[in-house]
Regions:
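Short, active-site-adjacent cap segments at secondary-structure transitions
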Residues: 10-12, 46-51, 104-107, 137-139, ...
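Ligand-binding beta-strand-loop-alpha-helix segment within the catalytic cores
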Residues: 57-137
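Catalytic-site beta-strand/loop segments enriched in glycine and acidic/polar residues
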Residues: 5, 119-154, 193-210
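N-terminal glycine-/serine-/threonine-rich phosphate-binding loop
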Residues: 1-40
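Glycine-rich beta-strand-to-loop/alpha-helix junction loops that act as flexible
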Residues: 6-9, 42-46, 232-234
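Glycine-rich loop at the start of a catalytic domain that most often binds anionic cofactors/ligands
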Residues: 46-62
């Protein structure tokens, strides 16, 4: 089984509120279908979640009743986005079912709690594809908090022990230098903590590298014996399919020891 996350930058236009990239999602769903692999899909929020969550400081927890309308709107927007993704998966012939994180699980001081994964395991055993997503989740300490798609990925990794974890993004992977400003920047095919430290020293443009670095940290925590974590560019047609079928594509891999 393979755990796949569609990043928000792939499935939406992050610069425009509630802008869904339907054609790209349709193609990615078909690539998953054509791989003949059993997968669990998680997706990020993109422009459906981040804008309102940031404007209303939702990740700081419950501070004031004035936040509640924003909580409701973000939850509505995320379920709307999820419904569109689930539809594309089903249209591609994949039996996908929504599992809303905020309706099914709790957090404790921003840490996702899935004490009883029986329902998720039962769905997988019956050939149903659960689709989870970043969401506003009730928090026992903070009242509520934002649960990211990456947090869900880490928790599902411990539950299902997948053979591979794939993060689908809008970039080829981690570079040794900022590729936007340096034509000699090289894609780093294999990353470990020492490599990541050297990249942090060489690259200083935080707004360009911060998201990639955070993703690499997540991948390094998740990779384990028999399970590599891969960051691949989903904006390029065929890359995800080739990767899932065992082919070589431009990407960055955190290899399990």
């Amino acid at each position: 089984m393979i755990l796949i996350k569609f990043g928000g930058s792939v499935i939406t236009d992050k610069s425009r509120y509630r802008t869904f990239n339907a054609d790209r999602v349709k193609r990615l769903c078909k690539e998953i279908r054509d791989s003949d692999e059993k997968v669990i899909v998680v997706h990020g929020a993109g422009s459906f979640g981040h804008v309102l969550a940031k404007e209303n400081n939702l990740n700081d927890g419950f501070k004031d009743p004035s936040q509640i309308p924003a909580v409701a709107q973000v939850c509505y927007d995320m379920r709307d986005l999820n419904a569109m993704i689930v539809k594309e998966l089903n249209d591609a012939g994949l039996p996908a079912v929504s599992v809303p994180t905020g309706s099914c699980f709790m957090m404790r001081n921003r840490e996702l709690i899935i004490d009883d994964p029986t329902v998720l395991k039962s769905m997988i055993d019956k050939g149903i594809m659960p689709v989870m997503f970043g969401d506003v989740v009730m928090d026992t300490e903070l009242g509520f908090a934002i649960c990211s798609g990456d947090q869900i990925m880490e928790r599902l990794k411990t539950i299902f022990n997948p053979s591979r974890v794939v993060f689908v993004s809008d970039i080829d992977g981690l570079y040794d230098k900022d590729p936007k400003n340096n034509k000699n920047a090289k894609l780093i095919e294999n990353v470990d903590r020492d490599v990541l430290k050297s990249v942090e020293t060489d690259i200083t443009v935080a707004d360009v590298t911060g998201g990639v670095r955070g993703k690499m940290e997540t991948m390094l925590r998740m990779c384990s014996e028999g399970c590599d974590c891969v960051l691949v560019n989903g904006t390029v047609e065929g890359r995800l399919l080739t990767l899932l079928k065992g082919g070589k594509v431009p990407c960055t891999i955190a290899r399990g020891e």
